[in-house]
Regions:
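Short, well-ordered surface patches within globular domains
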Residues: 2-68, 111
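A well-ordered secondary-structure block
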Residues: 62-134
């Protein structure tokens, strides 16, 4: 009976894993457009880089932390360089250029994801800051 329970639990966890991968793959195939909200954009970015090897935990940027208080525990920052506009940033993301750098955390321990975006016209950098709110 115990073995049967273990087998059932393993089947269920495999099914969940397959479902997660299916959803992730579906999202990755979708191109971003200008009509996408920042939330959709950030979710797509997070999903796409979820398996990225060059990831590490990042503190929420100071300005963001101050505006949100202690809620914002951590953040991923997605930075797109050489952008003249949000449209450029989207085009660059869709082309998957090498100058897209992503620092991310897994969102599974968080109930909410807040989004902030910063465009620096001088440095022509566009940052998406994805806040993880516990």
């Amino acid at each position: 009976r115990e073995q049967a329970c273990d087998a059932a639990a393993e089947m269920e966890s495999n099914r969940l894993l397959q479902e997660m991968n299916r959803v992730r793959t579906q999202r990755q195939k979708r191109m971003l457009t200008e009509t996408d909200t920042l939330t959709e954009t950030a979710n797509l970015l997070v999903d796409t880089y979820q398996e990225s090897p060059d990831t590490y935990e990042a503190e929420a940027p100071k300005a963001v932390k101050e505006s949100l208080g202690e809620q914002a525990e951590q953040a991923y920052q997605v930075m797109l360089v050489n952008c003249n506009s949000y449209t450029d940033a989207i085009a660059q993301y869709n082309e998957e250029r090498k100058d897209v750098t992503v620092n991310f955390l897994t969102t599974q321990d968080y109930t909410q994801v807040g989004i902030s975006s910063i465009y620096d016209p001088v440095g022509k950098q566009f940052s998406f800051i994805v806040l993880l709110l516990p």
